[in-house]
Amino acid sequence: MAPADFPASLPLCVCLLLASGLAQAGRLLVVPMDGSHWFTMQTVVEKLLHKGHEVVVVVPEVSWQLTKPLNFVVKTYAVSHTQEDLNREFKIFIDAQWKSQQEGGILPLLDSPAKGFFELLFSHCRSLFNDKKLVEYLKQTSFDAVFLDPFDVCGLTVAKYFSLPSVVFSRGIFCHYLEDAAQCPSPPSYIPRMLLKFTDTMTFKERTRNLLAYMGERAFCHKFFKSAADIASEVLQTPVTMTDLFSPVSIWLLRTDFVLEFPRPVMPNVIYIGGINCHQGKPLSKEFEAYVNASGEHGIVVFSLGSMVSEIPEKKAMEIAEALGRIPQTVLWRYTGTRPSNLAKNTILVKWLPQNDLLGHPKTRAFITHSGSHGIYEGICNGVPMVMMPLFGDQMDNAKRMETRGAGVTLNVLEMTADDLENALKTVINNKSYKENIMRLSSLHKDRPIEPLDLAVFWVEYVMRHKGAPHLRPAAHDLTWYQYHSLDVIGFLLAIVLTVVFIVFKCCAYGCRKCFGGKGRVKKSHKSKTH
């Protein structure tokens, strides 16, 4: 018998609530991208799993991060390359960045020696669909949606093959496919193209280059993705373009926001979730707490070029080590390469460091970063001014945006000297404006109605519940290029105007002939008679 203050109906209510929660749980298919792309995507997947959803992650058997023990169902498929092949191709890609930095937008990638790395990634999709047992399993499982990283295109192909609504999770989209597939207006007059390192306030010369890059992307980007599109066409048994693959996307979750990004128009199905990787700082381990405490009044500098850069050319590493030895701060440098012979006593090499936790410590004075989106947002969230050494991809643009906002200094990692790095560090540490600017950005970023992680989870669940989001799809998808720009209407109106002008002209000409042409003939006739 229940106590007097315990309603007999309460257990029933609890059961109904639990049942309703389970009834709303769905099945989600996840097609991720390896490397740092997976780190943040994994947090979204884990929260969805925690909320009761059934999650299946499809990954290649050869990868860096994807085959590590996970809390959800993982389905692997065999690939045609080994771990050594993957490491070798990626090393070629990284080595190329240490020889010459990416300039001129996306077009130089077409002939880059590092293109083999991308071709290897694109080949994963053929391997996935060659696994007939896995394909049959996916076909028999009633998924509600696909959660995907579009970098290697395979997730888009999977969504189209199984006719499932999809949610894209990415920092940004190469080429013009975001504006074409999501129909986001992207005027080249003030929206800089990716990899050009321009701001939204461009000179005439920059606007000219920006327009040429915009036109070049439309002319040549399909070549970069040719093998991916060919594989998709082979799988789907019909010719498809990259736009065909991107267009059905229900929701675009982009890891940026208007604290980092320049203001621009977006469509209602494009959701900004910048800072999703930022978390509340945890207490430091005894090892790192000891490093921080030993730094004294000068504090520490955190240095990391990301999880994908394991080694730096020896000469460049020694230049960096020399510069770090000239500042009074203790430097915690995440580095797994060969130890520079001139490493100073104030510089501590570690194979791993709790980056977000260190950046959140009050004794952190500066952050040396490669400007990847994860590091940039951790710097923003924790209010730490940055010295940025971008290497490839969106890192160039991220660095330019932070520099424009007065929150950091950008260095060309290939051309910089020890003096350049020393001066940059002293500038962001000693010039109070950098700290003030990054704190202002941090305040703006945190002033939001909902956390980015919760927002991302909401929209994934939204697509799962409603089997897509067709009501957010703009009608621009159904227009031809000349209808979109109203060229047919302009032509029609122009034809009317020209017709009216022509008629008026003819009427005037006729009137003139009637009024003046007859008199002229009469006078002429009169003169001839007098002779």
Swiss-Prot record:
Main location class: endoplasmic reticulum
GO CC terms of this entry: endoplasmic reticulum membrane
Transmembrane region(s): 489-509
Compartments where located: Endoplasmic reticulum membrane
Keyword Flavoprotein recorded: no
Disulfide bond sites: none
Tissue localization of expression: Widely expressed with highest levels detected in colon and kidney.
Gene3D superfamilies per UniProt: Glycogen Phosphorylase B
Glycosylation sites: N293, N431
EC number: 2.4.1.17
Signal peptide: 1-25
Pfam families: UDPGT (PF00201)
Membrane topology (UniProt): Single-pass membrane protein
Keywords: Endoplasmic reticulum, Glycoprotein, Glycosyltransferase, Lipid metabolism, Membrane, Signal, Transferase, Transmembrane, Transmembrane helix
CDD domains xref list: GT1_Gtf-like
EC supergroup of this enzyme: transferase
Catalytic reactions of this protein: glucuronate acceptor + UDP-alpha-D-glucuronate = acceptor beta-D-glucuronoside + UDP + H(+); 17alpha-estradiol + UDP-alpha-D-glucuronate = 17alpha-estradiol 3-O-(beta-D-glucuronate) + UDP + H(+); prunetin + UDP-alpha-D-glucuronate = prunetin-5-O-beta-D-glucuronide + UDP; 5-epi-5-F2t-IsoP + UDP-alpha-D-glucuronate = 5-epi-5-F2t-IsoP-glucuronide + UDP + H(+)
GO molecular function terms noted in the UniProt entry: glucuronosyltransferase activity
GO biological process: estrogen metabolic process
Subunit structure: Homodimer. Homooligomer. Interacts with UGT1A1, UGT1A3, UGT1A4, UGT1A6, UGT1A8, UGT1A9 and UGT1A10 to form heterodimers.
Entry function: UDP-glucuronosyltransferase (UGT) that catalyzes phase II biotransformation reactions in which lipophilic substrates are conjugated with glucuronic acid to increase the metabolite's water solubility, thereby facilitating excretion into either the urine or bile. Essential for the elimination and detoxification of drugs, xenobiotics and endogenous compounds. Catalyzes the glucuronidation of endogenous estrogen hormone epiestradiol. Involved in the glucuronidation of F2-isoprostane (5-epi-5-F2t-IsoP). Involved in the glucuronidation of the phytochemical ferulic acid at the carboxylic acid group.
Family the entry assigns: Belongs to the UDP-glycosyltransferase family.
Name of the protein described by the UniProt record: UDP-glucuronosyltransferase 1A7
Organism name: Mus musculus (Mouse)
Lineage summary: Eukaryota, Metazoa, Chordata, Craniata, Vertebrata
Gene encoding the protein: Ugt1a7
